[in-house]
Amino acid sequence: MRYTFYHGTDAKALKMSKEQRDIFRNVCNTVVDYYWNYFNEYRKTRNILSLRKKLTDPKIPYLFESFQNTLKITDKLKAGDKSYELGALYVTNKDYLAVSYSNRAFAFGETGLRAYRFVVAAKKLGIYEDLDGTIKQYADFVYRFGETKEEPVVCTLLDITPSMLLTETGKEVTKDNIMQHQSFRLKEDYELSPTTAMPTWLFARMCDKTKWPPCYR
C-alpha cells in the first residue's frame, strides 16, 4: 500500500543544491558544537539561569526558553538520543504538522534553527564579537540565512511505501505500525523541487481544518 506524506520546509532551502545543503548542514553543526561546548563550560561554573535577564527581549518572544531548549536537545543528541538525530529528510502523514514545521523552518530546518538560536543568544549576551576565523564566518552565514525573509512551503510526497521509511528513532516501519506514528525519516535521498512546493498559506487553506487539533487551527 502506498501513502501520501508531507514535508514542511522553507523555499530558501529548496533553492539550494544538494551539495549546498550538505555544506550548510555541516556549517550549522559546527556552530552548534562550538556554542554547546562554550555554554557547557559556562554551566559547570555558573548558574545558566543567570542569563535569563539578558536573554529576555519583548521583540524576541521566548528567547531564553528557546536557548535553554536548544541546550537540552544538544545534550540529548550528544548522549546518543536518536530522537534528535538530524540529516535525513523528515516527513509526516499529518498535514497540520507539515504546516507547523514549515513555519519554523526559516533558519534551515531544525538543524539551522539550533545554530541560529545559539547565534542570537550570543549576540544578546555580547559574546558574538569574540569570534574570529572560520567559526565567525560560519556564524555570520547562519545568522544571515535566518534573518533572510522566510518563505514557508509544504511539499507533498506521493506513493510512499512503509519500506521507504524509518520512525523518528530509526526503527523499521511496516504497514501494521505505520498509523501508530506521525513523523518519519526517509531512508533514501528524495530530491524536492521548489516548483512543486506549495506556499504554506495556500496549502493550509486547502486543508480540512475541522480535522485539525484545536491548537493547530
Question: Which ranges hold each PLM region?
Answer:
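ADP-ribose/NAD+-binding catalytic cleft of ART/PARP-like enzymes
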Residues: 1-84
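Aromatic side chains
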Residues: 6-7, 90, 101
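Active-site and NAD+-binding cores of ADP-ribose-processing enzymes
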Residues: 10, 14, 102, 106-217
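Intrinsically disordered, low-complexity acidic Ser/Thr-rich regulatory segments
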Residues: 53-90, 127-154
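Short HxH-centered metal-ligating active-site micro-motif
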Residues: 92-94
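Short amphipathic alpha-helices within nucleic acid-binding modules
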Residues: 96-102
